[in-house]
Design a protein with these regions (language model features):
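Nucleotidyltransferase catalytic core that binds NTPs
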Residues: 1-143
Length: 143
């Protein structure tokens, strides 16, 4: 509980907001108050090219989204520090982290959340849209 309501943690970079982000946030809002763990610029650079917008610009946009109640800085892809600090009842993350390099991050997040009875919710990604595809189009000059 955070301010008397179930807290739902949603990590994201939110460099290019698209319908998939909105869908994830709407799903998260069904479980409680949404707290976005917005990746810092440094955290994004660990796994993606330079963000188009800096942290403060992205924060302004994310704070304006209807389902979002709180925005906090996510310093790395290691969710444990923020999970321990805020102790959400739920964390919402797309299914892409079940395999590959993020599978260990996922396992750790599940273990940490379980310490206080928290759960991970993994909705399907929105078909036909992704930040990576949109960025490739922008960088390539094709729309």
């Amino acid at each position: 509980m955070y301010n008397g309501h179930p807290l739902v943690y949603v990590p994201m970079s939110a460099d290019i907001i698209h319908p998939g982000h909105i869908n994830i946030l709407k799903i998260a809002a069904e479980y409680g108050d949404v707290m976005v763990g917005l990746f810092s610029d440094e955290a994004i650079r660990e796994y993606k090219p330079e963000p188009y917008m800096n942290f403060e610009q992205r924060k302004i946009i994310v704070e304006a989204l209807k389902p979002v109640r709180y925005v906090v800085r996510q310093e790395s892809r290691d969710y444990e520090p923020n999970l321990r600090k805020y102790q959400p009842e739920f964390m919402v993350h797309g299914k892409d982290w079940r395999e590959g390099p993020l599978s260990t991050v996922r396992a750790r997040a599940i273990d940490v959340l379980a310490e206080w009875g928290g759960k991970v919710i993994e909705p399907d990604y929105t078909k036909g849209i992704s930040s990576s595809v949109l960025k490739a189009k922008v960088r390539g000059g094709k729309a």
